[in-house]
Amino acid sequence: MSQSKRLRIAIQKSGRLSKESQQLLKSCGVKFNVNEQRLIAHADNMPIDLLRVRDDDIPGLVMDGVVDLGIIGENVLEEEQIERQLAGKPAECTKLRELDFGSCRLSLAVPNEFEYKDANSLEGLRIATSYPNLLRRFMQEKGINYSDCMLKGSVEVAPRAGLSDGICDLVSTGATLEANGLYETEVIYRSMACIIQSNKTQSTEKQALINKILSRINGVIRARESKYILLHAPVETLDQIVALLPGAENPTVLPLNDDTNRVAIHVVSTEDLFWDTMEELTALGASSILVMPIEKMMG
């Protein structure tokens, strides 16, 4: 297949989304090997090329139509869209769906000794950040005057180094803030990884491949969120047992050989089956309870 007909997907070369982006595509049946010295990986079994680039380059590559799809954090996407709108550059793309990894929040944080009451406490402060556009939008909405200190990394050390009064940075667990003597004050943006598509017109062949990949991604994520549950149940408490199964739809009920008083139940559950629920099932006479992960789902 010619180069122009190959689907080009941009993913983060290294960082918090890189490994999970690669694993997601492999779970969708895309076979490829990554050479750390090369920026492009060619799929072995599909007309797909993976471009491994800096995360903040991905939105622009998609918006400019250089690549067809990109896997990126919503925070990076939003930051770049604002930047390009201000610069009068193309800033449009289509977000196909959120993914099930990369959860974080963009938050304001100040030193432990700082007395914070509300957002107005930030008036006149110098804030270090890698996300000046998202920070500016938040501060303008609140009517707060401030100055920013643009840093590309190690934002959390800025107050201790005397570069700023506070920071605006990504937070996952808060451990990094705590280690640097900071505490979180305001969440200004919540983010997940997402997959985006260029708005350029695609060939029928390439769009069909995009639809196939998206369908598989949907199936992979549904499978990750679901469990396959099997158990034996007394007929007399069947309705009560089915009602306890979280997220269950239309369970399969099968007779057991030589036992007219009990049945087998098979069900796909979209919620976790916790220990207390299993204990309630047991109290209703359920037995041989198995909870298994699902590798793939479709339909």
From Swiss-Prot:
It catalyses: 1-(5-phospho-beta-D-ribosyl)-ATP + diphosphate = 5-phospho-alpha-D-ribose 1-diphosphate + ATP. Keywords: Amino-acid biosynthesis, ATP-binding, Cytoplasm, Glycosyltransferase, Histidine biosynthesis, Magnesium, Metal-binding, Nucleotide-binding, Transferase. PROSITE patterns: ATP_P_PHORIBOSYLTR. GO terms for cellular component: cytoplasm. It comes from the Bacteria. Its EC number is 2.4.2.17. Pathway: Amino-acid biosynthesis; L-histidine biosynthesis; L-histidine from 5-phospho-alpha-D-ribose 1-diphosphate: step 1/9. It is found in: Cytoplasm. The keyword Membrane does not apply. Feedback inhibited by histidine. It is an enzyme of class 2 (transferase). One of its GO terms (molecular function) is ATP phosphoribosyltransferase activity. CDD domains: PBP2_HisGL2. Catalyzes the condensation of ATP and 5-phosphoribose 1-diphosphate to form N'-(5'-phosphoribosyl)-ATP (PR-ATP). Has a crucial role in the pathway because the rate of histidine biosynthesis seems to be controlled primarily by regulation of HisG enzymatic activity. This is ATP phosphoribosyltransferase. The gene is hisG.
